[in-house]
Curated annotation (Swiss-Prot):
It catalyses: (S)-dihydroorotate + a quinone = orotate + a quinol. Belongs to the dihydroorotate dehydrogenase family. Type 2 subfamily. It holds the Pfam family DHO_dh. Monomer. Its main location: membrane. InterPro entries: Aldolase_TIM (IPR013785), DHO_dehydrogenase (IPR050074), Dihydroorotate_DH_1_2 (IPR012135), Dihydroorotate_DH_2 (IPR005719), Dihydroorotate_DH_cat (IPR005720), Dihydroorotate_DH_CS (IPR001295). Binds 1 FMN per subunit. This is Dihydroorotate dehydrogenase (quinone). Disulfide bonds: none annotated. It comes from Christiangramia forsetii (strain DSM 17595 / CGMCC 1.15422 / KT0803) (Gramella forsetii). GO terms for molecular function: dihydroorotate dehydrogenase (quinone) activity.
Length: 340
């Protein structure tokens, strides 16, 4: 029903406006008595064989929602009822910021893709913390970034501020230095600034009574040499793992009229490359750290490929928009079928 009726209707409207409409609809729907139970019965797959223990955390299933969908932690309780094993909120910055000018979100229907240049629009870390106080036992990742106005030489201060503010309210952290939509942000992926940032966060982490896993989210556009640097940095800084991958700046093979819009490309065109990055990291590191696989998962088979390539968990975003919540159930059922 989603692909034949709901999606064609939603796709007639501006993608950013319909995103907020869907948010409000789901929030109101879940307030109806019995609605949450209905969604759980329709989409959740409960089976002990789906449970995963990764970087010291217990996941009820390995399928999560990637950052960017619930930026301000407004809907994580409702979204979890659709069958996700975990929800990643953000990207969150210390101060609120509006992001880039609209229009900044584009559907590429012929490519089953999206281009976004949102620019870390969010209400700031304090607002996110206040909403996470209402968590009803959802496993939460906190994706953190820097404010646009913060120069790179002071970026560490932004990341540590959000880390401290979110610490008691998330289960793991994601350091986002790979979005193409904040000027010069990707320069923080360079070896020395990245080591400095991660070492600083790890020192803060180690001072806590119970440290939290810190993950690094990387771009799909890194060269093999840069990926080898990532492996070295992860092992040297002793962070918990990697999320592979963020959106791409590549436009290879696109057909849609919006293909030349500036921003990060997500969806099916990213499927192959993100899996290649996962496989490279897994093989070259000899599976030294866990990987969350994300990028172009539109079918259960796409998710299986990432798990077989070396991912411990997977995340959805664009595939969730194009395929609907049934995709979560399909993936979990396929994992059981494959015995993974």
């Amino acid at each position: 029903m989603y692909k034949s009726l709901i999606r064609p209707t939603l796709f007639k409207f501006d993608p950013e406006e319909i995103h907020y409409f869907t948010f409000n609809f789901l929030r109101k729907f879940c307030k109806i008595p019995g609605a949450t139970s209905y969604l759980k019965s329709k989409f959740q797959v409960k089976d002990a064989r789906l449970e995963r223990e990764v970087f010291g955390l217990k996941f009820k299933n390995p399928v999560g929602l990637a950052a960017g969908f619930d930026k301000d932690a407004k809907l994580y309780n409702e979204l979890s009822s659709l069958g996700f094993g975990f929800i990643e909120v953000g990207t969150v910055t210390p101060k609120p910021q509006p992001g880039n000018d609209k229009k900044r979100l584009f559907r590429l229907k012929e490519d089953s893709a999206i281009i976004n240049r949102m620019g870390f629009n969010n209400e700031g870390v304090e607002a996110t913390v206040n909403r996470l106080k209402s968590n009803k036992n959802v496993l939460i990742g906190g994706n953190i970034g820097k404010n646009k106005a913060t120069p790179n030489e002071h970026a560490v201060e932004d990341y540590t501020y959000s880390f401290e503010a979110l610490f008691d309210y998330v289960n793991y952290f994601v350091v986002n230095v790979s979005s193409p939509n904040t000027p010069n942000l990707r320069e923080l992926q360079d070896k020395e600034p990245l080591k400095d940032l991660l070492n600083t966060l790890q020192k803060k982490n180690e001072q806590k009574k119970r440290p939290k896993p810190i993950l690094l989210k990387i771009a799909p556009d890194l060269t093999d040499e840069q990926l080898m640097d990532i492996i070295e940095i992860v092992q040297e800084t002793k962070i918990a793992g990697v999320i592979a991958t963020n959106t791409t700046i590549s436009r290879e093979g696109l057909k849609s009229e919006n293909k030349n819009e500036m921003g990060g490309l997500s969806g099916k065109p990213l499927t192959k490359r993100s899996t290649e990055v996962i496989r490279f990291l897994s093989e070259k590191s000899n599976k030294a750290f866990p990987i969350i696989g994300v990028g172009g998962i539109h079918t259960a088979e796409d998710a299986i490929e990432k798990l077989e390539a070396g991912a411990s968990l997977v995340q959805l975003y664009t595939g969730f928009i194009y395929e609907g919540p049934a995709l979560i159930k399909d993936i979990n059922q396929k994992i059981l079928e494959k015995g993974l």
